[in-house]
Each structure stands twice: as structure tokens, then as C-alpha cells.
């Protein structure tokens, strides 16, 4: 039950908690203190619900981010995949992206590589993976500010499975471009498991793993810390900043020492043979 695709366990934490009962074992990375799933809120995004079924502003900002990454020597080595929640948004982003790549002479950087950039929707992305996944939710407030609970494939039977596949494609980073927050989705008006999953995923992207919109009965919370707690306490007496029980799956690092030169990373991990060993 080990998960190998994602280099950061935050990238699979949502699916693990929501859909796999926290049964997937993941290994914390040295920079596990920061989630690699981020919400890019598009406050002026409008979903054209009655006509084109597109969200132009969301697409524009996503394409700008792709161009930024491909131009940056430090970021361009990471492969990119774009996932949309509708075919209309997929088609629009494909056209905008083609124009932007041609204008900036980035076609070779984007496509002449082992893993070329792709633009897909959540119904045909299964089997694909990339270092960086950029989402365009598309759905959100219309021109009157109303949010419809019709989210296309997510409302259909098995919509939650499509969501689960889509949000587990990234190896290094996931950015969610959305014109709505989780608070805008009213679950009292729908019993769709796919819509409930979208609300939970948006909240996960907004706030992190501890604030899922839907509680998971299977999520196990560590109760003691075992020997790792005492090791951390002793190391603190020597001036080291430490954390114990590090990790979001059932597999935990008993004690981790924070890098004094970079507080966002761990310097050392300590694993024990048992909780009282």
C-alpha cells in the first residue's frame, strides 16, 4: 500500500484521507512542513454558465502561470499538466495556451521534451502524471454572483472517482485556479458525492490537511507520540527545534529535527523500532 508517485505526501493526502481510508503509506519529505497543494483564488473570475460554459479570467491566469514557469530556468525542467473540470474550458485553454506559446517562442520548451505539456479534462486524464499539475475548476459565480451546484461530470454517478483520479496526478506541486472558495458550495442543496468532494478539495487547497470540509471517520489522529516525543524533548535541551509524529498517513517519522538554517525544512529524521523501544 505504499504510494510512490508524489514526491510530497501532501499531494496524495486528500485522496488518501477522503477515498482510501488513510490506508496508503506515504513517506514525509524534507520539506514536509509546507503543503505542495495551493489555491490560486481568481477573485474576478466569472463562469459563463448560460452561453460559452467557460471561465476566461481563470484560463488567462493559468496560461500566464504556464508561460512564467517555462521561461524560468529553475522551473522549466519540471513537466506540466493542465487539468480542467469541463471540456469547454479545456478547449479554451488549449487555444489560449497555443497562442501564448507561439507568441513567446516556447513551443519547443513545452513540447520537445520527454513529458510534453498536456491539457486534459477530469474525464480523460487517468493514466497521466506530471511534475506540476495546474487545475482550472472553471465553475463558480456567474455575472449575477450566483454559484450553481451543477458541476458537470462531478454531479454524475461516480463523479467522485473522476475527482479522485484528477487530484492525484502530480509528483511535485499542484495549483488550483478557482473562482470560488469551498464556502460557496452549499452541501445542504445536493447529495452528490462528487460535489461534496470538490468542496473538500477546495478547502484542502485553501487551508491544508487538517481542515477538510468533510470529516473522514477513517482518519486516525496520533494520540501519544511514543518515544519520538521524548527524543524530541531531549534534543530540544541541546538547542534543536524538533517535531514528533511527522507525517499525514499511518506511517510516521518518530522525530524530525528542523534545519536551523532553513526553518521550512527538516535536517534529520529519526525512526524507532517501536513506540516504546
Give the label of every model feature segment.
Residues 256-277:
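Short beta-strand-loop-alpha-helix junction that forms the active-site gateway
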Residues 248-257:
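Catalytic centers of nucleases
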Residues 105-133, 140:
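Conserved motor-coupling elements within RecA-like helicase/translocase cores
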Residues 22-101, 225:
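Conserved helicase/translocase motor-coupling segment
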Residues 5-8, 12, 59, 63, ...:
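Amphipathic alpha-helical transducer elements in NTP-driven molecular machines
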Amino acid at each position: 500500500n505504499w504510494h510512490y508517485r508524489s514526491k510530497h505526501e501532501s499531494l496524495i493526502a486528500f485522496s488518501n484521507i477522503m477515498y482510501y481510508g488513510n490506508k496508503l503509506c506515504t513517506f514525509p519529505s524534507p520539506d514536509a512542513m509546507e503543503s505542495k497543494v495551493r489555491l490560486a483564488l481568481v477573485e474576478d473570475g466569472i463562469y459563463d454558465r448560460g452561453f460559452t460554459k467557460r471561465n476566461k479570467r481563470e484560463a488567462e491566469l493559468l496560461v500566464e502561470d504556464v508561460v512564467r514557469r517555462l521561461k524560468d530556468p529553475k522551473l522549466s525542467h519540471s513537466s506540466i499538466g493542465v487539468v480542467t473540470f469541463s471540456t469547454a474550458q479545456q478547449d479554451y485553454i488549449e487555444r489560449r495556451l497555443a497562442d501564448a506559446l507561439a507568441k513567446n517562442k516556447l513551443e519547443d520548451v513545452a513540447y520537445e521534451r520527454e513529458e510534453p505539456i498536456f491539457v486534459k479534462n477530469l474525464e480523460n486524464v487517468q493514466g497521466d502524471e506530471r511534475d506540476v499539475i495546474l487545475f482550472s475548476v472553471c465553475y463558480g459565480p456567474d455575472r449575477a454572483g450566483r454559484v450553481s451546484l451543477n458541476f458537470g461530470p462531478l454531479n454524475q454517478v461516480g463523479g467522485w472517482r473522476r475527482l479522485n483520479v484528477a487530484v492525484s496526478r502530480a509528483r511535485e506541486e499542484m495549483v488550483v485556479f478557482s473562482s470560488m472558495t469551498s464556502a460557496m458550495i452549499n452541501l445542504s442543496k445536493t447529495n452528490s458525492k462528487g460535489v461534496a468532494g470538490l468542496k473538500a478539495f477546495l478547502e484542502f487547497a485553501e487551508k491544508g490537511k487538517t481542515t477538510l470540509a468533510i470529516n473522514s471517520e477513517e482518519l486516525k489522529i496520533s494520540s501519544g507520540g511514543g518515544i519520538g516525543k521524548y527524543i524530541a524533548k531531549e534534543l530540544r535541551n541541546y538547542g534543536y527545534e524538533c517535531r514528533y509524529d511527522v507525517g499525514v498517513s499511518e506511517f510516521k517519522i518518530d522525530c524530525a529535527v528542523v534545519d536551523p538554517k532553513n526553518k521550512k525544512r527538516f535536517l534529520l529524521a529519526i525512526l524507532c523500532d517501536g513506540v516504546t523501544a
